[in-house]
Amino acid sequence: MPDRDRLQMARDAYGAYVSGDRRVIEELLSDDFTFYSPADVGIDRDRYFERCWPNAELIEDTEFVRLVQDGDEVVVTYESTKTDGHRFRNTEVLTFDGEKICKTEVYFGWNLE
């Protein structure tokens, strides 16, 4: 059993986007991290930081709707508010290898406002 709570690690990962603290997310992702979404299928860690991390500047707040752990996976549904006031909802599946997130699958498309 990992020493760290995976649900808290998931919260910390999304919190990094709100705070803009890249160091936090860098520590949580494995070296062989892979990211999947309809827009980016199977990109590596470096490409993830190029494509996804800049969005941290646009995120003002994130509220969790669902956080469920099942074995090595944590399912997260969240609603985020952007700096322009628009809100959106995503669901993501985070896969862990020990105490690192090794894969993220993103399902998106819900604009709330």
Language-model segment annotations:
Residues 20-24:
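Short helix-adjacent coil turns
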Residues 2-5, 12, 18, 34-38, ...:
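A beta-strand edge to alpha-helix "cap/lid" segment located at domain peripheries
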